[in-house]
Amino acid sequence: AKESLFNVLNNRFDFDEIRVLDLFSGTGNISYEFASRGTVDLIAVDQNRNCTRFITATSEALDAGIHVVQADALQYVRRASTSFDLIFADPPYDWDHYEDLAKSIIDLGLLREGGEAILEHSDQTDLSHLPGFFAHRRYGHVNFSFFSRPQDLTEEDLSLIHISEPT
């Protein structure tokens, strides 16, 4: 699923020119993938101290320059003072605040012009009714919902809103 996601993103972004926020970063796999593709403006947020220590140590060993923050992801988003080109979030599948997170990202202006937020979730979560939603992709049991600033969505984008299962 990660490789397929990055194939999609590779067609939309110049990784070395974007600011990325990785929420619920866990052991940092998504952050390392962005760093390996040239992203230098990268923030990884996780609440677990062991995870943030691991990401910090790994980032230093790889000279990846990832800025690591130990914080609750939703609280971090609500207090963020900067905007991002790409926000990736992989909360636990049983997390109760997917809608709050998506709405906060859009309502608080955390996406730059042309920016996207991607939330990973289970089959049981449907975020397609939320403002800024424009696509859903499914890779096996892994689901990604894509969001952008509503003002960035064109009529063509809105007509393309879809749920897809790539083969």
Regions found by a protein language model. Name each.
Residues 1-160, 164:
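Class I S-adenosyl-L-methionine-dependent methyltransferase catalytic core
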